Curated annotation (Swiss-Prot):
The lineage of its organism: Bacteria, Pseudomonadati, Pseudomonadota, Alphaproteobacteria, Hyphomicrobiales. One of its GO terms (biological process) is DNA recombination. One of its GO terms (molecular function) is DNA binding. The keyword tRNA-binding does not apply. The keyword Transmembrane does not apply. Belongs to the 'phage' integrase family. It holds the Pfam family Phage_integrase. It comes from Sinorhizobium fredii (strain NBRC 101917 / NGR234). The active site is at R98, K123. This is Uncharacterized protein y4gA. Residues 53-187 form the Tyr recombinase domain.
Length: 187
């Protein structure tokens, strides 16, 4: 065990080693109550937790570059990909939405008059209403025009009926309601 303990010097390895030493100390103390209790070292756990909590904050220049790339993302087979990518990035950044929340947004969840968006089926199974900046509300213009008008039309995936003839072409790891789905306009 000493050889294994000395092999790696990562923070996660130190935390795992501390957990293992604590388990062995418990076993020894259970077998022989005269063994003094081992004081655990909280530092490895705190270092691992600190390492995983560091978010990456994009600079305004990085965000502008991502949004410009999303607006010019070429796709001859998916007519609405540019608008979808741009709106997804904007909502993720400005409203703090998660991927699953973005995928489940419906046109009925967006209230352009109030400038709010209703997020349903969140990570903790709650519904919340978020205010949106005017710049984000303006970006919904082109996407809401593609909707058939039903409140249950997906916001970030085009409808498959009406004037837009986009047909879902699911990838191997996706399904039609998933962000991994491509839409093909038959030609």
């Amino acid at each position: 065990m000493c050889q294994w303990a000395a092999t790696k010097g990562t923070r996660n390895h130190a935390y795992e080693r501390e957990k293992l030493e604590r388990a062995f100390a418990k076993i020894l103390r259970h077998r022989d109550p005269s063994v003094p209790p081992r004081r655990s070292d909280p530092r490895p756990r705190k270092e691992v937790a600190r390492q995983w909590r560091k978010p990456h904050i994009y600079s305004p220049a990085d965000l502008r570059r991502m949004l410009d790339i999303a607006r010019s993302y070429p796709s001859p087979r998916a007519a609405l990909r540019q608008e979808n990518m741009y709106t997804m990035l904007l909502l993720a950044y400005c409203a703090g939405l998660r991927r699953g929340e973005l995928a489940r947004l419906d046109l009925g969840d967006v209230n352009l008059g109030d400038g709010t968006i209703t997020v349903r089926q969140t990570k903790f199974f709650k519904t919340r209403i978020l205010p949106l900046p005017d710049s984000v509300v303006v970006s919904f213009g082109p996407i809401s025009l593609h909707g058939v008008g039903s409140a249950h039309s997906r916001l970030l995936t085009p409808p498959c009926s009406g004037t837009n003839k986009a047909v879902p072409a699911p990838r191997q790891e996706g399904s039609p309601g998933c962000l991994q789905t491509s839409y093909v306009v038959p030609g």
